Amino acid sequence: MLLLDCNPEVDGLKHLLETGASVNAPPDPCKQSPVHLAAGSGLACFLLWQLQTGADLNQQDVLGEAPLHKAAKVGSLECLSLLVASDAQIDLCNKNGQTAEDLAWSCGFPDCAKFLTTIKCMQTIKASEHPDRNDCVAVLRQKRSLGSVENTSGKRKC
């Protein structure tokens, strides 16, 4: 609990943990669960604990954002890695039609966006069982050009 006391951004999470809130219960009008709060604050240790206690990694809030979206918006590669390793759906779209990858690009976190692009490509290859890695390089280059701050019209439809 000492870590929570050092970070003023997680007062809500601290309260939830102290009161014994369910890991999947939406605690506020925005329908953000404790896992949303942990991912959105970049708190990988609390995210891991919640995932181990059965948190729903794909639960969406009123904006249609899952914890993966929250982690992408704050640039937490550690939280993204935990969520992906726990089989979070990387292709979920929020109400604006944006994936976590799209949000990472638009929020200025290219390392997170490239990570999600690579994971998506690996999942596509695994699903199709065609190990042509050149397709991944082409997709990554395309996303880099679309991911610039200047180009906001290149939104992908889901």
UniProtKB/Swiss-Prot annotation:
It is found in: Nucleus; Cytoplasm. Its main location: nucleus. GO terms for cellular component: cytoplasm; cytosol; male germ cell nucleus; mitochondrion; nucleoplasm. A motif (Nuclear localization signal) lies at residues 129-149. PROSITE patterns: ANK_REP_REGION, ANK_REPEAT. Ubiquitinated by the CRL2(FEM1B) complex, leading to its degradation. Keywords: ANK repeat, Cytoplasm, Nucleus, Repeat, Ubl conjugation. The keyword Repeat applies. Mainly expressed in testis, small intestine, colon, blood leukocytes and in pancreatic adenocarcinoma cells. Pfam families: Ank_2 (PF12796). SUPFAM superfamilies: Ankyrin repeat (SSF48403). ANK repeats lie at residues 1-25, 30-59, 63-92. This is Ankyrin repeat domain-containing protein 37. It comes from Homo sapiens.
